[in-house]
Amino acid sequence: MNYASPRHAGPLDALLIEVDRALQVLSRSAVAGRAYPAHAAEAPLADTEKRHAAGLMRVNHVGEICAQALYRGQAVACRDAGTRELLREAAAEEVDHLVWCDRRLKELDSRPSLLNPLWYAGSFALGVAASVAGVPRNLGFMAETERQVEAHLDEHLRTLPAADERSREIVRQMKDDEAGHRESAERAGGIPLPAPVRGIMRAMSKVMTGTAYRL
């Protein structure tokens, strides 16, 4: 099934599209629309460095699982056609990130998080809930999500093993894309979220990253 949602899909069609998307994401069968950005030669890494790089890329992979589900949840409950399209476009670009992180995990002889089904389900539900708050808050939620993801990616660029340029190339491209998503949401009318909401989002993100690094 095509990732793009038909503009006039009925409720059953919409449900089938979301189920298909979830299955493709969770089964690791999604296909990137852009070329793999890692071009540097694979450098030798010590076992501890390899495990650390894999842990960070697993965190990034979970982040893309969550972004995929979050934006799909926001879009499915959003009544504004323009906002829906913006969310779906961002979700489609996140597929590239998802596939890139998965490929890098394989190169590092590692695996995605064992909890991915839970991350996806929870994020989809959160996206639906965010959409109920209205378009400005919905877009504000998207912008804040991307802002926090950018901060995580900056940290990963600092803490990845010095020799792991392949992972860095992926993370740099992801960071550029996330900044574009944030700017698009702000231009479309997203408003800043209240400080308590931003704090809750950071706390939830901290739990996710700490867990995904190991599991």
From Swiss-Prot:
User: Among its keywords, does the record have Iron?
Assistant: yes
Q: Per its UniProt record, what InterPro entries does this chain match?
A: COQ7_proteobact, Ferritin-like, Ferritin-like_SF, Ubq_synth_Coq7
Q: Does the keyword Cell membrane apply?
A: yes
Q: Which GO terms describe its molecular function?
A: 3-demethoxyubiquinol 3-hydroxylase activity; metal ion binding
Which EC class heads this enzyme's classification? oxidoreductase
Q: Which UniProt keywords apply?
A: Cell membrane, Iron, Membrane, Metal-binding, Monooxygenase, Oxidoreductase, Ubiquinone biosynthesis
Question: Which Gene Ontology terms of cellular component type are present?
Answer: plasma membrane
Cofactor annotation:
Fe cation
EC no.?
1.14.99.60
Please give a single GO biological process term from the UniProt record: ubiquinone biosynthetic process
Summarize the protein's role. Catalyzes the hydroxylation of 2-nonaprenyl-3-methyl-6-methoxy-1,4-benzoquinol during ubiquinone biosynthesis.
Q: What is this protein called?
A: 3-demethoxyubiquinol 3-hydroxylase
Q: Which organism is it from?
A: Bordetella avium (strain 197N)
